[in-house]
Design a protein with these regions (language model features):
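Short edge beta-strands and adjacent beta->alpha junctions
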Residues: 409-540
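Bacterial N-terminal signal peptides
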Residues: 8-20
């Protein structure tokens, strides 16, 4: 595995061979090795805190009688990644522990999940273990996730809320389920206790439901988006923070009707919008391509599937991964035949928060190109910094390595400013002053045009503290770009008994050149509320 500081991503292994893990920054920077031995090191995954101050990489490592799950942490230090020691995650060492996944909360505390063939039920089981940001285990041993005892529980994924609550999803061939597999979920409190009961995610029970993925959705949903493949289509359903279903039924993601759709991935931004990507086979007469779609709640933000990279004759675009930054931009990576001098290579492409591709695709593996580079994964942190890791098969050496590369998304640079009060409706009437917000009435603030607090005309988003005061009833304030809430909304709830401060909220500004910010208050029974914004940084 190799890494570079502003860009993050992960790959899962397609081949089993003697492996080492490396990481490399983008552009430039030396590669670092995550793990190396004479045994196989495969199936890496990665997670980070919101600020990008600690990255956690997990993978499966071959041992004498099977596989173990290992982890290692990295902290940015002077433009490089400082590595901590690798450590084994599982305490049960018999048999095979495989297919790890990892996710972290706002501060970098993380949860690892994996599949084990040592389940007491006789089939495969799903297990988890929690750690703090320093890599200290919070559980004495792994715990069994599933309540279902019969059948096989496999291919787990995990999503973690900023406050540490988390959801584990997996596929299950429980007796009496669908024809093959169902998608199950279990929610947990931050302390590791179950929240709610084991949930059947899919409402469609005909055919096999498989390959689930999940992402945390912030307010107004305050829950999770789960995606999976089903009989040649990609489906999604939202769950609440305790795992209860929020949508009446599954929703089909893809509008492409020909061929079959598979291998979905999902990522959400801080506004609760979420991007889903997948591979599409046979729709255009060639082998495969990568498609995507973005949603706000249940509403799609692009009416039809977005072609992220159409395949060319006799090539394949496979196994997409996706991550989203604080501005709602998303980065997609995937395996590609034809973009690498030898075999499969890894490429990536940025999509902005209006669902427009930004520039051309970029080849990630520019150092090691021999053999096949496959199965990537991504994580984006504050300032649109990212880290990508993947597996590489080198036939001549009969080995597989894990590599990584880092960089920064276009328009994602973050700049701090001295904390400054930008807007206060308690002040006399003015562009950034009074009057107070009235319930149900939108107000647009020209925050850039006033040239205050060191915010330049080129700013695309602000990092702010939000305070709502003076309301006579409970309610909320929605903050969104001046040219439309569909681009991303921050929701701040308040009550008469206390003001509400949303620390380090990231609010998007309008993209029409005006740099405006809109606010809409909703108050029970009507009335008014005052809004205060203190800015501490901006993106451009």
């Amino acid at each position: 595995v190799k890494a570079r500081i502003p860009f993050a991503g992960i790959l899962l292994p397609a081949f089993l061979a003697a492996a080492s893990l490396h990481s490399q920054a983008l552009p430039g920077g030396s590669e670092i090795q995550v793990a190396a031995s004479a045994t196989y090191q495969v199936a890496p995954a990665i997670a980070s805190d919101a600020a990008g101050t600690v990255y956690t990489v997990v993978w499966q490592k071959q041992i004498a009688d099977g596989w173990d799950i290992y982890a290692r942490q990295y902290t940015p230090s002077g433009g490089t990644l400082a590595a901590g020691p690798e450590f084994r995650v599982n305490t049960l060492t018999a048999g095979c522990q495989q297919l790890p996944a990892v996710a972290a909360d706002f501060n970098g505390n993380f949860v690892v999940v994996w599949q084990s063939d040592q389940d007491p039920g006789g089939g495969t089981g799903v297990y988890a273990r929690r750690y703090n940001r320093a890599g200290t285990a919070l559980d004495a041993a792994e715990f069994r996730v599933h309540a279902t005892a019969a059948g096989n529980q496999a291919r787990p994924a995990v999503a973690v809320a900023p406050d540490g609550r988390f959801l584990v999803v997996w596929q299950s061939d429980q007796p009496g389920g669908s024809q093959g597999w169902d998608i199950l979920a279990q929610a947990y409190n931050a302390g590791g206790t179950t929240a709610g009961v084991e949930t059947l995610v899919n409402s469609l029970t005909a055919g096999a439901q498989s390959s689930p993925r999940a992402a945390y959705l912030s307010a107004p949903t305050a829950g999770f988006a789960v995606v999976w493949e089903s009989a040649g289509a990609v489906l999604t359903r939202r769950l609440g923070i305790t795992g209860a279903t929020l949508d009446a039924a599954d929703r089909q993601v893809n509008t492409t009707a020909t061929g079959f759709q598979r291998s979905p991935a999902v990522a959400a931004d801080p506004s609760g919008n979420y991007a889903i990507v997948w591979e599409s086979w046979g729709a255009d007469g060639s082998t495969s391509r990568v498609l995507g779609r973005r949603f706000q709640g249940v509403s799609p933000l692009n009416a039809t599937d977005l072609t992220i990279d159409a395949s060319v004759a006799a090539t394949q675009q496979r196994n997409p991964a996706v991550s989203s930054d604080t501005l709602g931009n998303w980065l997609v990576s995937w395996d590609s035949l034809g973009d690498d001098p030898s075999g499969a290579g890894l490429v990536a492409r940025q999509i902005d928060n209006r669902q427009n591709p930004v520039g051309a695709k970029v080849v990630l593996n520019n150092t090691l190109t021999a053999g096949d580079q496959t199965l990537s994964g991504l994580t984006l942190t504050q300032g649109s910094r990212l880290l990508a890791v993947w597996q590489s098969l080198t036939p001549a050496a009969d080995s597989a390595v894990i590599e990584a590369r880092s960089g920064t998304l276009a328009g994602g640079d973050f700049y701090t400013v001295q904390p400054c009060r930008l807007l206060d409706t308690r002040n006399p009437s003015g562009p950034l002053g009074g009057p107070a917000l009235s319930s149900g009435s939108q107000r647009v603030f020209p925050v850039v045009a006033q040239s205050l607090c060191g915010i330049p005309a080129t700013a695309k988003a602000l990092s702010v503290n939000v305070t709502a005061v003076g309301a006579a009833a409970v309610g909320s304030v929605n903050l969104y770009p001046g040219d439309g809430p569909a681009l991303g909304t921050v929701v701040v709830n308040f009550s008469p008994s206390r003001s509400t401060i949303a620390d380090n909220a990231h609010v998007l500004l309008s993209r029409d050149g005006s740099g405006n910010l809109a606010a809409l208050a909703t108050i029970t029974g009507g009335g008014q509320v005052h809004l205060i914004l203190d800015v501490n940084g901006y993106y451009q």
